[in-house]
Amino acid sequence: MQTDPFKEYLKQQEPDKKYKGYAWQTAIGLQAVDGLKPSEYLVDAAIQNIEGKITLDEVKNLLDSYYEEKPQKNHDRTEEADKVSIRIAKILSEHAFSFTPNEYISIHRKLFTGIYDHAGKIRDYNITKKEWVLNGATVIYGSASELRKTLEYDFMKEKHYSYKGLSMDEIIHHLAVFVANLWQIHIFGEGNTRTTAVFFIKYLRTLGFDATNDIFAENAWYFRNALVRANYNDLKHGIHETTEYLELFLRNLLLDEKNLLQNRLMHVDYKEMLVREPKIEYKTSEANIENRKVNIQLEKVNIGMFGEKISGISKKTIQHMEQLCDSFDKNEIFGRSRVEEVTGLK
């Protein structure tokens, strides 16, 4: 993978730079939930903002001018990724927040005005979405006729919930249930996961959680898949909705734990995948184990590097390649249908 230019800022002692770095890294990382990747132009502008050379408003103006001069059709949705990224960074940089359905809807409007016609509007039609993690099945999303009432009910229930006396395990479980239920309503036609993530981060702050690390930025697709698994049942095949994956994510986010967050572990057919993997024989030895450990990071394919060396390869193709690397073992055999499920290509 390409080096993250924002990671160094998370180690900064200067609070302003550290927080700006977190806001930008999260904003850009969240685009991965829809398979989007911002432009290098935005990344460069973001770094200038973190360094204090330009303001967020100036970044926005630069970006608007950039796309006015580049009006051609953007098939990989880079313009959407760029504009939504700066809007997320701006919202995360603001302290104002109210725990209300209107705030939730307002965040969607702020993120997607000029991008989606339905920005800030509750959908009036029912939806299904094929999910890779469910092997092509869909979550049952909220009914169009009941969306507003369902949203208001979830907010009312959470607002009157008391965290007093709960252990941290109980708090994290409850937060996982709350955000999973909020996302399942899927009140908008598009942009639900990014809206939910931004709202949830803002809400966590009101509960006293800092959450200024790179967990959302580096595991945005995991977050979405964990939300899916928290809302899916197939009892006939022994599959039950579970918040266990979401809780692992939250423990890393809120408690700085180092739980393994791997998408393929959530796949409903993961056990079958294990059966197909070659067996490895382990032998006890007094040898220096440290020298024999596999350096997983070095084994990962640097997809971004190939994008620079092969002319004509698009950012969208690179994103699809990254998703495939994340979803399958290097020894796993997979066919066209699995590729379509992971990438959304048909």
Explain the meaning of each model-derived region.
Residues 1-346:
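FIC/Doc superfamily catalytic core
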